[in-house]
């Protein structure tokens, strides 16, 4: 699920945040970015 990390990772409104990427990688994604305080896995 692309949004599996949204509730687990807090992040800044804009830009990139390491916890988001780490969470996404744990779920098998390549990484993630933060958009509007939410983590989006890529």
UniProtKB/Swiss-Prot annotation:
Is ATP-binding a UniProt keyword of this protein? no
Tissue specificity of this protein: Expressed by the venom gland.
Q: Name one GO molecular function term.
A: outward rectifier potassium channel inhibitor activity
**Which compartments is it annotated to reside in?**
Secreted
Q: Which PROSITE patterns match?
A: ERGTX
The terms describing its cellular component in GO are: extracellular region
InterPro entries given for it? Ergtoxin (IPR012622), Scorpion_toxin-like_sf (IPR036574)
Q: Which GO terms describe its biological process?
A: envenomation resulting in negative regulation of voltage-gated potassium channel activity in another organism
The intrachain disulfides are: 5-23, 11-34, 20-39, 24-41
Q: Which UniProt keywords apply?
A: Disulfide bond, Ion channel impairing toxin, Neurotoxin, Potassium channel impairing toxin, Secreted, Toxin, Voltage-gated potassium channel impairing toxin
Q: What does this protein do?
A: Blocks human Kv11.1/KCNH2/ERG1 potassium channels (reversible, IC(50)=3.4 nM). At high toxin concentrations, block of Kv11.1/KCNH2/ERG1 macroscopic current is almost complete. Does not accelerate the kinetics of the closing process and has no effect on the activation and inactivation kinetics of the Kv11.1/KCNH2/ERG1 channels.
The free-text domain remark for this protein reads: Has the CSalpha/beta fold, which comprises one or two short alpha helices connected to anti-parallel beta-sheets stabilized by three or four disulfide bonds.
Family recorded in the similarity comment: Belongs to the ergtoxin family. Gamma-KTx 1 subfamily.
Q: What protein name does the entry list?
A: Potassium channel toxin gamma-KTx 1.10
């Amino acid at each position: 699920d692309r949004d599996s990390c949204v509730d687990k990772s807090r992040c800044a409104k804009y830009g990139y945040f390491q916890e988001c990427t780490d969470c996404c990688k744990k779920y098998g994604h390549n990484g993630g970015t933060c958009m509007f305080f939410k983590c989006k896995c890529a």
